[in-house]
């Protein structure tokens, strides 16, 4: 008896790349090993009844008829518990019915969110329409990824930032050719690079109404309940300095004494109640600093790194199209916030440095792919170090 919903294991979360195991393979193995398999999304069934998964799994156990107890005995056991009896019985029945119905042995499909019609001032809507019109003129295979990319960068910053995104995409498209693999990959990875995680974005995400609604739903909170949210914060000196004006921040970052002082002041674990007025306003003010972001050291650093990455990819384009595509794909190594971002950036730089060593080989694109995959295998970078050592051995 198993639930088809997924709760990611620590080993899946800590992989730098996509470490999520294939749920379909797990279910297929269960089908081979077990005499009989009962599988359904028992977690969703329980949540829909305001209960927990143990109640719906209890119902599935009753439906399996492998224990010498009638259904009524299971229900009586729930009633004797005396806590949350009503929702638990409903979840029990839902699990029982799902097991009896014989739910298909497949992992649940991901539901993609449906697009929303934008609303706002007429001037901004006109600018938005102009940007979407530019996307409509792109090749269809590029436009499919450029649309969500445009939405992402505008949500991160503003419409002008969206224009900059499309300008970068047009520059690449002008040098591309059908079937436009280079521009298609760039549409996705440029959007991710432009929407980097900084203090402003993290604070903004923590004060979104959708986040509070999601957490309340996960906790089963009702209208009559008070929801207390505690944020765990651990800012580093680098993150504090990244909010300073670019030139000033660069001077501070280059001064070890100043960085040590900031580290002593800020680099400690903190708990902040974001449901309190003070905590919420602090995060809300930080999240509202989008207008300040383009002036910061972090923005200058990210933009310079982005431009250098694109310049490197386009530099390989005339002689090796596939290598240019692989360099664009290497951007997936850079993700996350704080230490995670720093580790990803270090791996990215190491991969591109190794690619430059094999750029003249016929199999350069294949080596670029191997290096990227090696970098994604483990957090410590041991696989990447091994791949680089292999390259150095035949140079």
Task: Name each model feature, range by range.
Residues 119-126, 137, 141, 156, ...:
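Alpha-helix boundary/N-cap detector
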Residues 131-254:
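Segments forming glycine/polar-rich beta-alpha architectures that bind adenosine-containing cofactors
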Residues 197, 203-395:
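C-terminal amphipathic alpha-helical interaction region
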């Amino acid at each position: 008896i198993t639930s088809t919903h997924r709760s990611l294991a620590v080993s899946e979360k800590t992989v730098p790349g996509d470490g999520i195991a294939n749920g379909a393979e797990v279910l297929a193995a269960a089908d081979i090993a077990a005499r009989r398999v009962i599988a359904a999304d028992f977690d969703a069934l329980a949540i829909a009844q305001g209960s927990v998964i143990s109640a719906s799994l209890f119902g599935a156990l009753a439906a399996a008829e492998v224990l010498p107890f009638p259904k009524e005995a299971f229900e009586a056991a729930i009633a004797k518990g005396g806590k949350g009896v009503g929702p638990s019985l409903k979840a029990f029945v839902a699990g029982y019915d799902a097991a009896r119905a014989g739910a298909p042995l497949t992992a649940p499909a991901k539901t993609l969110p449906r697009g929303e019609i934008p609303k706002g001032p007429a001037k901004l809507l006109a600018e938005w329409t102009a940007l979407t019109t530019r996307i409509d003129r792109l090749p269809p295979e590029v436009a499919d990824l450029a649309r969500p990319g445009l939405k992402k960068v505008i949500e991160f910053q503003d419409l002008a930032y969206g224009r900059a995104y499309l300008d970068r995409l047009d520059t690449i498209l002008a040098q591309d050719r059908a079937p436009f693999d280079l521009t298609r990959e760039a549409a996705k990875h440029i959007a991710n690079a432009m929407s980097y995680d900084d203090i402003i974005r993290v604070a903004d995400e923590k004060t979104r109404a959708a986040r509070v609604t999601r957490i309340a739903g996960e906790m089963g909170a009702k209208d009559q309940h008070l929801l207390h949210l505690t944020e765990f914060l651990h800012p580093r000196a680098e993150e504090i300095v990244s909010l300073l004006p670019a030139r000033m921040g660069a001077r501070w970052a280059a001064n070890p004494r100043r960085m040590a002082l900031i580290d002593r002041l800020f680099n400690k674990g903190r708990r902040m109640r974001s449901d309190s007025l003070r905590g919420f306003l602090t995060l809300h003010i930080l999240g509202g600093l989008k207008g300040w972001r383009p002036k910061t050291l972090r923005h200058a650093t990210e933009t310079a790194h982005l431009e250098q990455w694109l310049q490197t990819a386009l530099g390989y384009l005339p002689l090796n199209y596939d290598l240019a595509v692989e360099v664009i794909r290497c951007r997936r190594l850079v993700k996350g916030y704080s230490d995670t971002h720093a580790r990803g950036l270090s791996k990215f730089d190491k991969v591109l440095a190794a690619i430059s060593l094999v750029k003249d080989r016929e199999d350069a694109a294949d080596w670029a792919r191997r290096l990227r995959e090696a970098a994604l295998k483990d957090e410590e970078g041991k696989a990447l170090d091994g791949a680089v050592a292999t390259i150095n051995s035949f140079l």
